[in-house]
Amino acid sequence: MLKRILAGGLAVVMACSLFTGCGSSGASSSAGALTAIPEEAKKDVVSYLTDGAITSEETVMTVNGVEIPASAYFYQWAYFAGYLAYYYQGKDATDTFSLDKEINGTTYKDYLLDNTRSSLLASAIAAQKGQEQKLKLSADAKKTIDNLAESAYENTRLYYATTLKGMEFLETCSDYNDQLKAALFRKGGEYEITKETLADYRKDNVMAAKHILLLTTGKSDEEKAKIKKTIQGYLDKILADKDPASAFEQYMNEKSEDTGLATNPDGYTFLPGEMVPEFEDAVSSLKVGEIDPKIVESSYGYHLIMRIEPDMDAIDDEDLKEKYESETYQKVLDDWSKDAKVETTKALDDLDMTKVYDKLTQLQSVIQAIAQAEAAAAQAASSGSTVSE
């Protein structure tokens, strides 16, 4: 339950197919008066969402001269918004997601904009580097792009506020990204992975910790204050005990509200980027065997943390290799991007993204209802056919 909700960079964006609509959008159930897909949305979904301020095919962002169409920008933004809404409702089903709520001191609205920008920056840099190195699209990417009109249904494109042009741009960037990454890590490449490389990375990066968690999700400020006072009492008694480590274990087993405790009784072994930042930062600041003398607060609640010796075998070589590649490639992208000239249009900067989000979730709710009705009708027809036979 401590995993980060969004990882940075291009890889996460491309992990989900552009055409299948994996995951839930978290579309609002209070979807206004919409009962059908508006003709304006069918004509130009971005123009519909922005009340005519921006069209789907116009450039809204440039990176070193690489032009990013609105249909690519809003796909990325809509995808991240859906992911965040899904995460939020899973974390607190009693509350309603909105862009004005905060995560780690930042509104979801700003968090979405930052992630969309950084993701598209990585996409554009991949496109630029691909062009500079005269890369050609892979056969698989060509096939995907050639089949976009058939595989990316109109309602799927509307659902993610995109068009064939936006999808082609992102697919091209993704393919260049994959080729660039493969070249860096293959045998003889600049970052060729050896047994020694993985051994050093494992030694320097694998961490482990146990924690006592008291949840604060959905609690009022007054309730949070009481919970914090309670966990401070636990901490005081643990640190005053003649055997703090044993006392920590006892309180963890008796008081922790971490639902993962049953499957992780010996603590969590993890790599950088796999836990929420507050937890990870606290663990990395401790020595093995040390108990943090301070309460750590995250979006889940209040933690007491004890760093422990990691189980090195808990992280297999393939996971380690994947993490090393991802982290190293992100550093390469960051290096390529540090002097990038990034510009966004005034029309994009001036948008009320809360209003855009509200219109998008209304549209998504209608599309979901249509899909459910079609699925029910198809099942009914299939059942009828079976009975008649």
Located regions from the model:
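C-terminal motif of bacterial Sec signal peptides marking the signal peptidase cleavage site
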Residues: 17-21
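PPIase-associated folding chaperone regions across multiple families
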Residues: 24-55, 159-226, 274-389
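Sec-dependent N-terminal signal peptides
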Residues: 3-13, 24
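N-terminal targeting/tethering segments
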Residues: 33-164
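Peptidyl-prolyl cis-trans isomerase
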Residues: 233-279, 308-309, 314-315
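Second-shell loop/turn segments in exported
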Residues: 58-64, 102-117, 126-136, 166-167, ...
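Solvent-exposed loop/turn and edge beta-strand elements of beta-rich ligand-binding domains
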Residues: 3, 28-31, 39, 67-75, ...
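Structured segments of extracytoplasmic/periplasmic soluble domains
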Residues: 76-87, 115-136, 144-159, 179-191, ...
